[in-house]
C-alpha cells in the first residue's frame, strides 16, 4: 500500500491530475489510441486467460484436495452466520450429526463487514433469545430519531410519524462488524467450522448440472499470471447443499444467475454505493442514541441518495456517518466519494465534526431494488440468502434483520430436507424449494411487499421528492396494500449519459479537517492485498476502457470507485491514455462491476485474506 500511495503521489501523476481537474474532462481527441499505439496488457487473471494454454504452467500439479460436508456456506456475514448457527442449533436439538463448513474471504470474521448500522433486533431475538446474557454488542438503544431535507444552507425538519418506515423506536445503533464477530463466536461454539481467509472462487457442479460445492482460489501466482514457487491449488468443499451468502452482488451468485436463469422472472437489480466514516468527536457534542437521516443537498432531485449520522455509546464520543448514492445516477462526472465529502460541510453537519478526528473509512454497494428484483432463490444443490439476492428494506434503510431471517429460514428448510428420509431429490444436489416457500410466508416478505413501491416512485419527474410525496400519501393510507406495483427502469449500468450531454461537476478541494482526499481515506480502511498477484479486477476486453468508456463517458470508473482503483494515465510510448488498475486499493465494494457502462469489468476474488481490515464498521 505504501508503495502504491507513493507512486500515486509522484510529480508526473500530480501534474496530469491537475490538468485533468482544470479541464474537468479529457478532450475526446486525446482519449483514443494513436494508430501507432498498442493496447497494453491489463488483465492477466486465469479466469480470462486459461492456464492450459500457457506454457509457463506445464508440469504444475493442478490436483485439488477435497473435503466433504453436509452444508457449505460462502460468506460469514449476518445471513451466513445465522444459517450456520441455526443449522447446528437444530442438529443439537434433534441429536443429529450435521457437518457445517463456512468460508470467509476476510482474514478475520467481520473485517469485510460494513453497514450504518441501525439494527432491528427482531431476527437476532429469534436466533439468540438470550443475546443480552451472551453479551451481544448492542450497546446503544435509539433514544432520538430525526429526519430532514437539506438545501445548500438549511435543514428542513420532517416529522417521523408512527408507522412510517423511518421510525427507529426499539432499534439499536451497532457496529455491525463487532456484531458479526460475536455471531462467529456463537457459531463456532455450536460446532460450525469457520474458515476465515479462504476465498470461494469457483462453483463446482455434478455431471447432472446440480451444484456440488465450491473451490477456494489458488494462491502463489505472479502478477503476470505465472506460477510462483509457492503456488498452491485451492481446496474443494463438497456438500449436499451450498448456501451462497456473499453479500451484495456476489461474484459466484452472478454465475448462478446465468447458469440457472434465476433472474428470468424479476426485474434487474438496482444498487446504491454506501460510504462511511467513524469519528471521535468533542464530548460536548455527543448525543448517544441519536439517529439522524437526511435527503437532498448536495444531490439533485433526480439522483437518489441520502445520509446518516449515528451517535454510538461505545465508551468514547463516537459517531458513525455515511452517505448513500443510488447507482442509477446519470451524470458520468458525479463522484459519490466527493459528494460525501462535500455533504460534511453542510451547516447542520460540520459543527458536529469540528474538533473531532476521523478514525476509519470504508465503502460497500447495497441492493435497493426491493421485492421486484428478488431472483429465484433455489436451484439444484444450493440457494441464495441475505444481501446476495437482496432483502434490504430501502425506505427503512435496513437489511441486516431480513438477511438474518433469510438465513434462519434457509437453515430450517435445509434441516428438514437433510433429515427427511422419505424425500428424494432428482439430482445429486438437494433442491430445497421449501426455503423460498417459507420465505414468502414470513414477515420478511410481508415487510418488503409493503414498501415495494417507495424506491421506484423516485423515478418520476419530481425525483426523490416525488418518492417522498408518494410515501406520505399512499404508504400512509394503504400501508403497502395499493393494488399496483411500480417498476424500476432497467440496469444501473445503462443509465449514464454521454459526457458531452452532461455538465462537469466542480468539487471543492478537501480541507484536511472535515473533508479529505481519496488516498488518505483508503489508508484508513486498512486495505491490503498481496502486490504480486494478478489484478482481481478483470477486463473482458482491455481496449474498452479507453476506446469506449473514456471516449464517450470521460472514464466514469475513475469517479465511481470509492478507493482510487482506476486511473487513466498517459501511455509510456505513443499518444493517448491507458487504464491503470490499482488493485491493492480495492475495498471490495463491487461498484465497478455494477456501474461500468460497458459491463466490461468482472470482479473476482483476490487471494484469501486480502482486502479491507475494518474494525467494527
Swiss-Prot record:
One of its GO terms (cellular component) is mitochondrial inner membrane. Residues 577-606 form the 4Fe-4S ferredoxin-type domain. Its EC number is 1.5.5.1. A ubiquinone binds at residues 305-306. The keyword Oxidoreductase applies. GO terms for biological process: electron transport chain. Its cofactor is [4Fe-4S] cluster; FAD. Keywords: 4Fe-4S, Acetylation, Electron transport, FAD, Flavoprotein, Iron, Iron-sulfur, Membrane, Metal-binding, Mitochondrion, Mitochondrion inner membrane, Oxidoreductase, Phosphoprotein, Transit peptide, Transport, Ubiquinone. It catalyses: a ubiquinone + reduced [electron-transfer flavoprotein] = a ubiquinol + oxidized [electron-transfer flavoprotein] + H(+). Transmembrane segments: none annotated. FAD binds at residues 71-85. Its main location: mitochondrion. It is an enzyme of class 1 (oxidoreductase). The keyword ATP-binding does not apply. The modification Phosphoserine is found at residue 551. Binds 1 [4Fe-4S] cluster. GO terms for molecular function: 4 iron, 4 sulfur cluster binding; electron-transferring-flavoprotein dehydrogenase activity; metal ion binding. Residues 1-33 form a transit peptide. Monomer. Accepts electrons from ETF and reduces ubiquinone. Belongs to the ETF-QO/FixC family. This is Electron transfer flavoprotein-ubiquinone oxidoreductase, mitochondrial. It comes from Bos taurus. The gene is ETFDH.
